[in-house]
Amino acid sequence: MSDQFEKLLTTFQHHLEVERNLSVHTIRAYMGDLTSLVEHLEKLGLNDISTLELAHLRSWLANQGVKGGARTTLSRRAVSVRLFTKWALKNNYISKDVGATLATPKGHRTLPAVLDVQKAALAMDSMATRAAEEESPISLRDVAILELLYATGARVGELCGLNIGDIDYNRNTIRVLGKGNKERVIPMGKPAIKAVQVWLKNGREELV
C-alpha cells in the first residue's frame, strides 16, 4: 500500500474512533473493507484518491462478489465505502462523493424458523411452571405475553401496542393495529384469556 493511501486510511480510522465513536469491531470491519478496496485500486493503477470514480468502486464490489462474498458482507462493504467517500469529500480529498450512488446488494431473505407444536407446548409449560414457582408479576406478565403470541399470531409490535380495552372477553377476540394502521380482530383461546386475566388480577398493578 502506498504512503498516501496508508496515511489516508489512518486518518479515516481516527475519524471513526474519535468523531464517530464506533465500536472496535465495527471499525475493524470497515477498515478491512477499505484496505481491500485500496489494494484493488492499486492493482488498477490508481494511486491518487482524487481520481477515484464510481466505476472503480463498482469494479471492486463486483470482484468481491466473484470471490464468493456473502450478500450481507457485500452490503456492509458498500456501507463502508459510502461512509468513506462522504468523509473524503467533506475533507477535500475528492471533489465529488462518488460512493453516494453505490448500490447496496440486497440481502437474501429467508422465512423465519418456527416452533413445532411440541416445542411450543414445552415453552408454554416451562413459563407457566416458572410463574407458579416465583409468583412474581413479571412471570405472570411473561406468561400472558407468550400465550397471546401463540394464540393469536400477532406481531410483537402489535402486541406492544395493545390496550386492555382491545380484548373482548365475551367474544374471545382481541383487536390489534397492524402495519399501515390496519385494524384486525383475532380470535383467542381460553388459555390466553385466562393468562391475561390472572396477570391483570395478580400482577399488573405492581408493574404499572
What residue ranges belong to the model's regions?
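Conserved catalytic core of the tyrosine transesterase superfamily
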Residues: 1-208
